[in-house]
A protein has these predicted regions:
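DNA-recognition helix of helix-turn-helix
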Residues: 50-74
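Short, basic, alpha-helical segments at the C-terminal edge of helix-turn-helix-like DNA-binding modules
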Residues: 73-84
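Residues within the helices of the helix-turn-helix
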Residues: 44-45
Length: 84
């Protein structure tokens, strides 16, 4: 999760929004990512907020993060940001 956190934490909302569009996240996938990364919720809290089981939430979460990390420039940018 650290690469997706690095990318999300870059602070450039236009790049993040463009990545979401390019990854073709559906509403629930986007909501899952936003609850964990923007609202700092645990997966359990986010699942409750979405009125789904933790297992279903994890399906949304992993689908969303896999789609985002499958975009080559997102992966490269996240790796660059992750270098300390």
């Amino acid at each position: 999760m650290s690469l997706i956190k690095s990318f999300w934490g870059c602070g450039d909302n236009q790049i993040i929004e463009f990545a979401i569009v390019r990854a073709r996240l559906n509403h629930r996938e986007r909501q899952a990512v936003e609850l964990v990364l923007d609202e700092c919720m645990t997966q359990e809290q986010a699942a409750e907020a979405m009125c789904v089981s933790t297992r279903r939430f994890q399906d949304y979460w992993y689908s969303a993060t896999n789609k985002l990390m499958a975009i080559p420039w997102v992966m490269a940018y996240a790796k660059e940001l992750n270098i300390d």
